[in-house]
């Protein structure tokens, strides 16, 4: 099947935002204007096309990122809808990995909110070019100029307005396009009847001021234009657009536009902005990977290159079973073909290929370079796996996911539900890499762990709804860790020689505190321990580190230097050295000033002025550390770091302290030492 749209006419982009900034509504409107939706879906009535899981429709938030294809003025747009709730950062992370550009939606009343910062940092990590759409311009308290300031201050980004609003709050009628220097006024409810006219007289000065600032910002990114600009020459519309596109793709400028998706104003202009300023697959660096020899290899976005694709999300569909959402980076992926899953080293057959439109699907013969779609029929593929041809194997860069910070015990209400629950949990863990499940060896309970209370609520909800497993749920538990404060040396000898073949392993190690991941250094000289036994010592230490000496929590942030030991010609074995390694680790830990660490959350609380003192007092009583305060639209914003263990049930406490008027958002920030008294309490409970 010949390619319908050339690569330069592709835009693969995501829509990212804080919860409630109007992201799903904005996506709905894009689908409406691009002709893929005949009736507009409203998040308020739970009728939105993008939010296709029942829990999303009930809660009015987007949980699963659905990739949708639509068309606009001769361009193919692939939109990835990403959740704005912090518990679902995994979805954002995985969608950013396969995007070329993004639109950040801000709420005109609030500007940059906590989750906006989180998502922005994630996008920085992948170097994703962005534009900003200031939504809800019709809402009371809307302030476009304040939004731009919050972007500059809190995100340290070079935000440049390319539109300014005409009126705001209930007087919002349209915008001035600063590039063309014309006013765009919306005449009807569906935003189809648009009048283009001169800039209103009362906005002329403001438009001139912002237009001059925009032209200067664009000229600064291009030497030729800068010379013209300094010589006082007029820059043409074409020159400005070309330079703005280049500066946006290079992350030098973040263009800012405005609108009200709910009122159908400004969405078409935003889609034009996506086409004009966000990159095509040819504008961004080609994807990198490693071949089987461990050498770096680059795959250009071209149908003629060997096929390589990344499975960025696994979902279970009630009608067709397992779907693997995939982006093809190079070559062509054909239905019915055999490919190699190079991450797992297994062959897979591509069953059917579908292009998703929110929750309906269109079957296709093939997916070409830069296309996104879902593969049905893959058996062994999980999130982050690479699919490629057997003739030219490659493993594309892996995705990294954070470890869970909260866990709960869960059990089925009936004996018969046990097996069903096991199958369901493993399916859910396949879909979501930040969700983990295991059996507690001591109690025999099934434990589920995730990124926050809402995350686990939704997992339990899905067990009941999709898999028909009724569960009892325990109280949430914090994922503590343990670490050490000082470097120590320790040794251990494991010797058993009583008739027959004995066991002998002996090692000396140094355990050193670090900031990073676990490291193992082999500093053995002169063959004190034979080379084949070194990995056994490492494995013994790794296993022992899963359960520390204070309260049995995993030990992190340390390095081991194995520097001496001894062996026995006959009695030494891998097993003996593994046991010696684990004994040496425990001996070292006992001397190394071990401490308990707890997850600390970054919390942002928004409250009316009159409740401020009460709420700050409450933050302090929760062992919170104040980071700062701002005021926004008559409300006070309190920023603080608070231990996760103190945040359980906070929503209810805040509601009662502020008569339902306070809101908060939190995300995991870092691990920190637990105070001595609490360490003893946690250890006491665990060691009962």
Curated annotation (Swiss-Prot):
SUPFAM superfamilies: EF-G C-terminal domain-like, P-loop containing nucleoside triphosphate hydrolases, Ribosomal protein S5 domain 2-like, Translation proteins. The keyword GTP-binding applies. GTP binds at residues 17-24, 81-85, 135-138. Its main location: cytoplasm. GO terms for molecular function: GTP binding; GTPase activity; translation elongation factor activity. SMART domains: EFG_C, EFG_IV. It is found in: Cytoplasm. Residues 8-282 form the tr-type G domain. Keywords: Cytoplasm, Elongation factor, GTP-binding, Nucleotide-binding, Protein biosynthesis. Belongs to the TRAFAC class translation factor GTPase superfamily. Classic translation factor GTPase family. EF-G/EF-2 subfamily. PANTHER family: RIBOSOME-RELEASING FACTOR 2, MITOCHONDRIAL, TRANSLATION ELONGATION FACTOR G-RELATED. This is Elongation factor G.
């Amino acid at each position: 099947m010949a390619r319908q749209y050339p690569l330069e006419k592709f835009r693969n982009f995501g829509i990212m935002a804080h919860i409630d900034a109007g992201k799903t509504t904005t996506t709905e409107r894009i689908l409406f204007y691009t002709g893929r939706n005949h009736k507009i879906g409203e998040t308020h009535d739970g009728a939105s096309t993008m939010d296709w899981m029942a829990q999303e429709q009930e809660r009015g938030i987007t949980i699963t990122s659905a990739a949708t294809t639509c068309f606009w003025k001769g361009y193919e747009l692939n939109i990835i809808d990403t959740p704005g709730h912090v518990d679902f950062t995994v979805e954002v992370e995985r969608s950013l990995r396969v995007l070329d550009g993004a639109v950040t939606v801000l709420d005109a009343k609030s500007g940059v909110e906590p989750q906006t910062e989180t998502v922005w940092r994630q996008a920085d990590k992948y170097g994703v070019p962005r534009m900003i759409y200031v939504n809800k311009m019709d809402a009371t308290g809307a302030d476009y100029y304040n939004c731009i300031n919050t972007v500059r201050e809190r995100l340290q980004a070079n935000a440049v307005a390319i539109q300014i609003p005409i009126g705001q709050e209930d007087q919002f009628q349209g915008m001035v396009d600063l590039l063309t220097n014309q006013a765009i006024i919306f005449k009807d409810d569906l935003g189809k009847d648009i009048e283009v006219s001169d800039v209103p007289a009362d906005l002329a000065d403001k438009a001139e001021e912002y237009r001059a600032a925009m032209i200067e910002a664009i000229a600064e990114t291009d030497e030729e234009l800068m010379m013209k600009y300094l010589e006082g020459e007029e820059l043409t519309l074409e020159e400005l657009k070309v330079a703005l596109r280049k500066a946006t793709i290079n992350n030098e400028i973040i263009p800012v536009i405005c609108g009200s998706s709910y009122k159908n104003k400004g969405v078409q202009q935003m889609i034009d902005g996506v086409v004009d300023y966000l990159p095509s697959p040819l504008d961004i660096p080609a994807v990198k990977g490693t071949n089987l020899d461990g050498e770096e290899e680059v795959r250009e976005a071209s149908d003629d290159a060997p096929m390589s694709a990344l499975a960025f999300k696994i979902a279970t569909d009630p009608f067709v079973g397992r779907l693997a959402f995939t982006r093809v980076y190079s070559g062509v992926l054909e239905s019915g073909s055999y490919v190699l899953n190079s991450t797992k080293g297994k062959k897979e057959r591509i069953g059917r290929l579908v292009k998703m439109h929110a929750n309906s699907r269109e079957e296709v013969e093939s997916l070409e370079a830069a296309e996104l779609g879902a593969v049905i029929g893959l058996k062994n593929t999980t999130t982050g796996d690479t699919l490629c041809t057997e003739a030219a194997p490659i493993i594309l860069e892996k995705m990294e996911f954070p470890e869970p910070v909260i866990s709960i015990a869960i059990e089925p209400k009936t004996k018969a539900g046990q097996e069903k629950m096991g199958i369901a949990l493993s399916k859910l863990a396949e879909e979501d890499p930040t969700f983990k499940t295991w059996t507690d060896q001591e109690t025999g309970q099934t434990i589920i762990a995730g990124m926050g209370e809402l995350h686990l609520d939704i997992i339990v909800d899905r067990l009941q709804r999709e898999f028909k497993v009724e569960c009892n749920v325990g109280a949430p538990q914090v994922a503590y860790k343990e670490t050490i404060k000082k470097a120590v040396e320790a040794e251990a000898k494991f010797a058993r020689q009583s008739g027959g073949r004995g066991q002998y392993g002996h090692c000396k190690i140094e355990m050193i505190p670090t900031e990073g991941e676990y490291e193992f250094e082999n500093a053995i000289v002169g063959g004190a321990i034979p080379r084949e036994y070194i990995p056994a010592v490492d494995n013994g230490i790794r296993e022992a580190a899963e359960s520390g000496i204070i309260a049995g929590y995993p030990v992190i942030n340390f390095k081991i230097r194995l520097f001496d030991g001894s062996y026995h010609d006959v009695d030494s074995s891998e097993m003996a050295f593994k046991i010696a390694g684990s004994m040496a680790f425990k001996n070292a830990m006992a001397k190394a000033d071990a401490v308990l660490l707890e997850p600390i959350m970054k919390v942002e609380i928004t409250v009316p002025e009159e409740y401020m003192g009460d709420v700050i007092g409450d933050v302090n009583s929760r062992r919170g550390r104040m980071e700062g305060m701002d005021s926004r639209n008559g409300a006070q914003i309190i920023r603080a770091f608070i231990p996760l263990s103190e945040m359980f049930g906070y929503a209810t406490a805040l509601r009662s302290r502020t008569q339902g008027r306070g809101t908060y958002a939190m995300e995991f920030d870092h691990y920190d030492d637990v105070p001595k008294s609490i360490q003893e309490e946690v250890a006491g409970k665990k060691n009962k």
